[in-house]
């Protein structure tokens, strides 16, 4: 009994340490990263274009766009994040902050979004009763994953959309367990507000619709009527929140729903290379602008590298900051450890996902298994199709489906539950290598600014 208690205390200490590490890494990254650096579609405050300009548009007192949003870069996005950011800037000004400082502090919002995402990831792990090593592994992968570190400092709308997507997964699981009104309204709000942040948040909606249908099928006459009432209320809340912006742009300015401008470095490699050619000379993304002979073209290398380093070459960043030689060499060395450990973890997590979702031995409730399979299958299918159809490097950026990180971590944790074979130490070693190398990379990156 005493030995079991000591082990539980050790697990609690490790969980607390990982939580603290997540807070430190994300907060420190925001501290040393300016609001214009390592961003996506932001450009910068005062530039007149990009998502920073979209924030400024609302800060200037405008309520809604009164021109074709395609005329300014980044203005085609749904406006929730930009409205919240404008209000946050205004509040800081009331409190005495200078405008420039208030703009920099928009990163505080995205940092908070990343913390909320981690908290709801933990709740999802708790829902599936992960514990001990399985919980530590799943939580550590989600807590220190560089994708969330990067998004914590990114002032575009991605982190808010990811936050609502993870919240949707949690509330859908709770609704499936107990379809009470509070969970129904929470689901409507998280999907609707997620789409108001970024339309791609709708990728989780079909899986939610699936569990709604399953409930209707298994409900009696009285239960069917009750579920129908909830669905009507859900639709009345969710649809206007999620669709008013794209529908308004379509009706007023002729902007197609789901409009995305052509952007990004072109990829000219044939299909077989994009799928099977996984040779790489460095852990960071290969781009012609960094002096590489080609733009990253393999979809699997693209998704791993962008999830870890964004579209940056951190070794070059170290050199440009005057830390070439040893500094760039150490960054590359830890970059390789991070890349290799992340790749091996991704393979094991994929195997775990297939095993868990294809067998009732791991998740007893068929509806939960179907829901998680729909979340994963639809998201991956849309993401891969987007990469292959787009023909540009930018389409491979993993930030579009970053909410799949806790999903994959969950699958690994479920797979690990109750096992005592070689999988446990293997996952432990890989997770430790992943954690240490991610920490080293993002601490060293502070030297490059």
Language-model features, listed with the residues they occupy:
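Transmembrane-helix signature of polytopic, membrane-embedded enzymes
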Residues: 97-101, 121-144, 163
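Transmembrane signal-anchor helices characteristic of membrane glycosylation enzymes that use polyprenol
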Residues: 9-48, 235-251, 380, 433-440
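Membrane-lumen/periplasm interface segments of specific transmembrane helices
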Residues: 229-345
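Short acidic/glycine- and proline-prone juxtamembrane loop motifs at membrane-interface regions
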Residues: 147-160
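Transmembrane-helix motifs of polytopic, lipid-linked glycan transferases
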Residues: 104-129, 167
């Amino acid at each position: 009994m005493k030995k079991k208690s000591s082990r539980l205390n050790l697990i609690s200490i490790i969980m607390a340490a990982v939580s603290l590490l997540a807070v430190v890494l994300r907060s420190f990254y925001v501290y040393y990263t300016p609001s214009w650096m390592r961003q996506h579609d932001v450009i910068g405050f005062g530039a007149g274009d990009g998502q920073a300009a979209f924030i400024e548009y609302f800060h200037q007192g405008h309520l809604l766009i009164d021109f074709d949003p395609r005329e300014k870069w980044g203005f085609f996005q749904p406006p929730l994040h930009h409205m919240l950011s404008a209000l946050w800037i205004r509040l800081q000004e009331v409190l005495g902050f200078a405008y420039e400082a208030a703009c920099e502090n928009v990163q505080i919002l995205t940092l908070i979004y990343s913390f909320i995402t981690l908290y709801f990831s933990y709740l999802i792990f708790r829902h599936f009763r992960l514990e001990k090593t399985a919980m530590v592994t799943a939580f550590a992968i989600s807590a220190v994953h560089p994708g969330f570190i990067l998004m914590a400092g990114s002032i575009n709308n991605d982190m808010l959309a990811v936050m609502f997507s993870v919240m949707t997964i949690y509330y859908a699981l709770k609704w499936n367990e107990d379809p009470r009104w509070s969970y129904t309204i929470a689901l409507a709000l998280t999907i609707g507000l997620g789409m108001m942040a970024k339309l791609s948040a709708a990728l989780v909606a079909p899986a939610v619709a699936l569990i709604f249908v399953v409930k209707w099928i298994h409900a009696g006459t009285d239960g069917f009527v009750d579920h129908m009432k909830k669905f009507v209320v859900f639709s009345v809340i969710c649809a206007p929140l999620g669709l008013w912006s794209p529908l308004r742009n379509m009706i007023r300015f002729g902007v197609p729903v789901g409009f995305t401008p052509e952007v990004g470095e072109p990829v000219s490699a044939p299909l077989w290379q994009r799928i099977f050619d996984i040779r790489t000379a460095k852990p960071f993304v290969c781009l012609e602008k960094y002096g590489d002979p080609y733009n990253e073209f393999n979809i699997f290398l693209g998704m791993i590298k962008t999830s870890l380093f964004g579209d940056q070459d951190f070794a070059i960043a170290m050199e440009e900051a005057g830390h070439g030689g040893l500094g760039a060499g150490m960054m590359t060395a830890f970059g390789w450890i991070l890349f290799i450990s992340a790749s091996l973890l991704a393979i094991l997590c994929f195997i775990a996902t297939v095993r868990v979702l294809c067998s009732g031995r791991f998740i007893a409730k068929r509806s939960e298994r179907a829901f998680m399979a729909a979340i994963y299958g639809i998201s991956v299918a849309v993401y891969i199709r987007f990469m292959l159809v787009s023909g540009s490097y930018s389409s491979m950026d993993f930030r579009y489906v970053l909410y799949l990180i806790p999903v994959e971590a969950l699958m690994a944790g479920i797979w690990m539950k109750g096992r005592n074979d070689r999988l446990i130490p293997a996952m432990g070693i890989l997770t430790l290598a992943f954690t240490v190398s991610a920490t080293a990379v993002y601490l060293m990156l502070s030297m490059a600014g």
